[in-house]
Amino acid sequence: MQLLKKRILQDGKCYEGGILKVDGFINHQMDPVLMKSIGVEFVRRFAATNVNKIMTIEASGIAPAIMTGYLMDLPVVFAKKKSPKTIQNALSTTVHSFTKDRDYEVVISADFLTPNDNVLFVDDFLAYGNAALGILDLIEQSGAKLVGMGFIIEKAFQNGRKILEEKGVRVESLAIIEDLSNCCIKIKDQ
């Protein structure tokens, strides 16, 4: 995805500790044209699967998941980071946020994640794989099946992909960051 890579290099900001800030176009202010391109690419990569539901975790995964769901004409469900009083048949798990350095209990209603679902998980970042592992747990609890995981940006210098692939997960990342040393963004050629 050349458009995405160009945007990361142009507008992404690097901070110590392996943090890449893309809040000007992905996860605070969003670029709808870029989001559409991201959705189109996820559709291209997962069109041959039997996916019938798109899943994400709030909040930064919602925009790319909605775009992908819209383009595939599929429902989108997201795991919530706070359990509303109105949720019924809740499935829950604990997820550690790398960026915020805290744990969240994430929940989803079993009414919206069932054994009949073939799930594509879409999110903004893959770092250590914490959110993805939490989603795997929710999918297992529900009896649904995972067809794959799509990430806008992957940090290859962290071990999220390795952990997921060891569990048999298909991982597709649209931009892979090889290194952020000295606040220089190095993107892998794909």
Curated annotation (Swiss-Prot):
GO biological process, one term: XMP salvage
Listed GO MF terms: xanthine phosphoribosyltransferase activity
One cellular-component annotation, GO: cytoplasm
Binding site for 5-phospho-alpha-D-ribose 1-diphosphate: 127-131
Enzyme Commission number(s) of this protein: 2.4.2.22
Binding site for xanthine: 20, 27, 155
Listed InterPro entries: PRibTrfase_dom (IPR000836), PRTase-like (IPR029057), Pur/Pyrimidine_PRTase (IPR050118), Xanthine_PRibTrfase (IPR010079)
Keywords annotated in UniProt: Cytoplasm, Glycosyltransferase, Purine salvage, Transferase
Subcellular location: Cytoplasm
Domain of life, per lineage: Bacteria
Gene3D superfamilies: 3.40.50.2020
Metabolic or biological pathway: Purine metabolism; XMP biosynthesis via salvage pathway; XMP from xanthine: step 1/1
Listed CDD domains: PRTases_typeI
Main localization (coarse): cytoplasm
Catalytic activity annotation: XMP + diphosphate = xanthine + 5-phospho-alpha-D-ribose 1-diphosphate
SUBUNIT field: Homodimer.
Family the entry assigns: Belongs to the purine/pyrimidine phosphoribosyltransferase family. Xpt subfamily.
NCBIfam families in UniProt: PRK09219.1 (NF006671), XPRTase (TIGR01744)
Role this protein plays: Converts the preformed base xanthine, a product of nucleic acid breakdown, to xanthosine 5'-monophosphate (XMP), so it can be reused for RNA or DNA synthesis.
Name of protein: Xanthine phosphoribosyltransferase
Species per Swiss-Prot/TrEMBL record: Bacteroides thetaiotaomicron (strain ATCC 29148 / DSM 2079 / JCM 5827 / CCUG 10774 / NCTC 10582 / VPI-5482 / E50)
Gene this protein is translated from: xpt
